[in-house]
C-alpha cells in the first residue's frame, strides 16, 4: 500500500514531464535582475612540423601549446521600454589570460584582454534578439566584435520551443582558440544541435537540462608578407551538457569539451591536434 501511495504522488510529475511540456529558450535574459558569470577556457594543442626528423630537441618533435582564459562578468538587466526593447549593462570585472609553449610561459595578446574593467551596453528587441552592443571607443579600435563576443560568452540558444526529447539546430561561429600573427581574428563556422533531456525545478525556477553537439570548420588563407600566404584547414567537433534557467533565461552551468584537427600548407607544412574545454557558471539575483 505504501508503494502505491508513493507511486500515486510521483507518477503525475513524471507524466507531466513526459507529457509534452514545451519550454522557450531565449537569448534575452529576463528583465530586472543581475546575473554574474564565471567562464574558464583551457586549450592544449600539439603542433608537428611535416617532413622533419624526430628525436629529442629536433624540429620534428611536437610543439606543445597551452592556454587558459578566465573571465568574470556582471550583467545588470533593466526593464523593457514601451516598444518591448530592453537594455543590459555588462561589466567585465576580471579577465586573465596565459599561454605556454612546451611548458614555458609566454606573453599573449588575448582578444579579450582589452575588456578588463570595461562596461558595455547590450540591447535586445521585443522578440529577444540581441540587436546592438555598444562599448568604449577604445574597444572598437581594438577590433573586437563586441556583439559576437557577448553572444559567445553568455551562451547561444535556439529560439524555438522544445519538449523533452526534441532537438533544435543553430548556426555556430567559433573563434579559433590560438593567437594568429598580427592579432588577426579567425573563426570556424558550423552548427550546434541541442537536445532537451529533462526539466527540473529549483525553487520557483525551471531548469532545462540539455545536451548539445558541435561541428565547425575553417579553411582560410593566412598572409605571410611578401612570401604569399599559408592555407589553414581546421575542423572542431565536440559536445557539452548545460543547465538553462528557463524563467530567468540565463546559462546556469555548462561544460563543453571540443577536439580539433588541422593542417597548414604553403610554407613550412604542419599538422595540429588539440582539445579545448569551456566551463561556465551563472547565478542571478534581483537588483
What are these regions (language model features)?
Residues 7-17:
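Hydrophobic h-region of N-terminal signal peptides that target proteins for export
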Residues 1-5:
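Positively charged n-region of N-terminal signal peptides that target proteins for export
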Residues 18-287:
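Signature of exported/secreted
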Amino acid at each position: 500500500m505504501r508503494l502505491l501511495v508513493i507511486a500515486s504522488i510521483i507518477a503525475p510529475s513524471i507524466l507531466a514531464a513526459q507529457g509534452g511540456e514545451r519550454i522557450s529558450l531565449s537569448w534575452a535574459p529576463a528583465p530586472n535582475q543581475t546575473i554574474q558569470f564565471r567562464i574558464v577556457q583551457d586549450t592544449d594543442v600539439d603542433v608537428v612540423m611535416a617532413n622533419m626528423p624526430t628525436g629529442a630537441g629536433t624540429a620534428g618533435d611536437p610543439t606543445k601549446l597551452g592556454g587558459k582564459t578566465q573571465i568574470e562578468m556582471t550583467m545588470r538587466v533593466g526593464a523593457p521600454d514601451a516598444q518591448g526593447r530592453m537594455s543590459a549593462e555588462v561589466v567585465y570585472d576580471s579577465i586573465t589570460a596565459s599561454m605556454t609553449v612546451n611548458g614555458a610561459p609566454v606573453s599573449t595578446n588575448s582578444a579579450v584582454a582589452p575588456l578588463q574593467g570595461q562596461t558595455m551596453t547590450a540591447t535586445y528587441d521585443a522578440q529577444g534578439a540581441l540587436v546592438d552592443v555598444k562599448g568604449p571607443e577604445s574597444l572598437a579600435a581594438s577590433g573586437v566584435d563586441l556583439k559576437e563576443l557577448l553572444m559567445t560568452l553568455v551562451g547561444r540558444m535556439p529560439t524555438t520551443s522544445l519538449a523533452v526529447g526534441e532537438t533544435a539546430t543553430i548556426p555556430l561561429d567559433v573563434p579559433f582558440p590560438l593567437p594568429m600573427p598580427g592579432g588577426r581574428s579567425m573563426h570556424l563556422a558550423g552548427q550546434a544541435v541541442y537536445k532537451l533531456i529533462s526539466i527540473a525545478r529549483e525553487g520557483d525556477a525551471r531548469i532545462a537540462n540539455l545536451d548539445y553537439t558541435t561541428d565547425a570548420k575553417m579553411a582560410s588563407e593566412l598572409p605571410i608578407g611578401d612570401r604569399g600566404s599559408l592555407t589553414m584547414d581546421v575542423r572542431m567537433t565536440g559536445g557539452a551538457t548545460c543547465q538553462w534557467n528557463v524563467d530567468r533565461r540565463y546559462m546556469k552551468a555548462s561544460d563543453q569539451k571540443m577536439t580539433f584537427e588541422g593542417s597548414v600548407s604553403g610554407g613550412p607544412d604542419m599538422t595540429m591536434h588539440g582539445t579545448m574545454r569551456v566551463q561556465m557558471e551563472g547565478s542571478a539575483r534581483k537588483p
